[in-house]
Structures are given as C-alpha cells and as structure tokens.
Curated annotation (Swiss-Prot):
List of residues binding ATP: G12, A13, G14, K15, G16, T17, R130, I139, Y140, I202
InterPro entries from the UniProt entry: Adenyl_kin_sub, Adenylat/UMP-CMP_kin, Adenylat_kinase_CS, Adenylate_kinase_lid-dom, P-loop_NTPase
Record-level GO cellular component terms: cytoplasm
Species assigned in the record: Thermotoga petrophila (strain ATCC BAA-488 / DSM 13995 / JCM 10881 / RKU-1)
EC number, UniProt record: 2.7.4.3
The protein's name in its UniProt record: Adenylate kinase
Length: 220
C-alpha cells in the first residue's frame, strides 16, 4: 500500500480527524504542518526553528521557502517512504509546485488532493460548538462530543471555555479567507486531474470509505 495524499478543506472540515483515522487503518503517517511547526519552535538547538519562531513572534507569515524546508525535512523521514497524508500544506501554488518537484526527484507523484467540501453554515455550527478545558486542554463539541456534565470537563471538572477563534464572527472570517487563499491551490490540482471532491457532511465512516475508494483500497 502506497499513497501520497494532500487533504484540503475549510477549518472545521475534519481533515485532522480523517487523517488520523486513515493512519490507523493504513499505517500511512498523518503529517500535520501545524504540529510540525509547534514542535520545531520548541527545539532550542534547531536553527530553522529559531528563524521561524522569530518570524512568528513578529506576527509575520512564514515565507514559502522556510515552510517548504520544514515540510521537506519531515517528508524525508523513513516513515514517509510508503506515503503520507498532508494536512495544512500546501497553502499556496508555489508550495504545491515545490511538493511536486520534491516527489518527482524521488520518482514519486501525488496520488490525489482530496477536497472535503463543507458549507459555511455547517462549519459555523461545528466550530462555534467547540469548547476546550482551560486546565488540561481537552477538546469537546457541544453537539458531537459533549461533556458528561453541562459545560464541565469530564476529567478536571473545570468550566469549559470557547476559544476566540471559535466565535461566530471569527469563524465566518476564517471561512472567507480559506476560500480566497485556497481556491488557487484547488484549481492547480483540478487542472492536473488529481483533485477528488468528498462531501464532508456525510459522517466520519462514510467519508473514510470515500477516501479509501479514491486511493483504490477498501476498508476491510
């Protein structure tokens, strides 16, 4: 089994959830660029991490060449030889082109770019219902993953909070930005003939089954 996948979709589409489930089924690693960046800036002796941390602390966007270098480093690790599921990258056409070149140099190519389509109102409903425990960081959803007691963490019994990012006005803004920024990447993969669209509202099991069909596997 080999597959080189990119997951695209708005915030709240469930990309990370689907990628983790597919990793469990296939053994192909879920590579979250958000996780990579959080890890790299914590490393005191990593020059690349120091550069990125300085840029982020200034509130600036990390340039493509540094993002590409971080991703290249991770994809060059042994566990990615049979494939990967990229979540959070590429965000620009330049990054998509870099990924193509990186794979081409290894005589590989992207299997598919999977676009999880979720309407704005569903994203708003999902994300505004998200709550987090301020003590342990556990994430809940008042609709799909509620705590046992009303708005209290199951573990800490502390009142759950809503992140600023998950307030309706912010969620709608993030969705708009996603459409503007990601459309060129969607168009890029569409022109290459490897864009696969999946309805992100049909439930986790059905979504996973659709992705397994796309890569030519069946969930047995």
């Amino acid at each position: 089994m080999m597959a080189y996948l990119v997951f695209l979709g708005p915030p709240g589409a469930g990309k990370g959830t689907y990628a983790k489930r597919l990793q469990e089924i296939t053994g192909i690693p879920h590579i979250s660029t958000g996780d990579i960046f959080r890890d790299i800036v914590k490393k005191e002796n990593d020059e690349l991490g120091k550069k990125i941390k300085e840029i982020m602390e200034r509130g600036e966007l990390v340039p493509d060449e540094l993002v590409n270098e971080v991703v290249k480093r991770r994809l060059s690790e042994k566990d990615c030889e049979r494939g990967f599921i990229l979540d959070g990258y590429p965000r620009t056409v330049a990054q998509a082109e870099f990924l193509d070149d990186f794979l081409k140099n290894q005589n590989k190519e992207l299997t598919a770019a999977v676009l999880f389509e979720v309407p704005e109102e569903v994203v708003v409903q999902r994300l505004t219902a998200r709550r987090i425990c301020p003590k342990c960081g556990r994430i809940y959803n008042l609709i799909s993953l509620p705590p046992k007691e009303d708005e209290l963490c199951d573990d800490c019994k502390v009142k759950l909070v809503q992140r600023e990012d998950d307030k309706e006005e912010t969620v709608r803004h993030r969705y708009k930005v996603y459409l503007e920024k990601t459309q060129p990447v969607i168009d890029y993969y569409d022109k290459k003939g490897i864009l696969k669209r999946v309805d992100g509202t049909i439930g986790i099991d059905n979504v996973i089954a659709e992705v397994l069909k796309i890569v030519g596997w069946s969930d047995k």
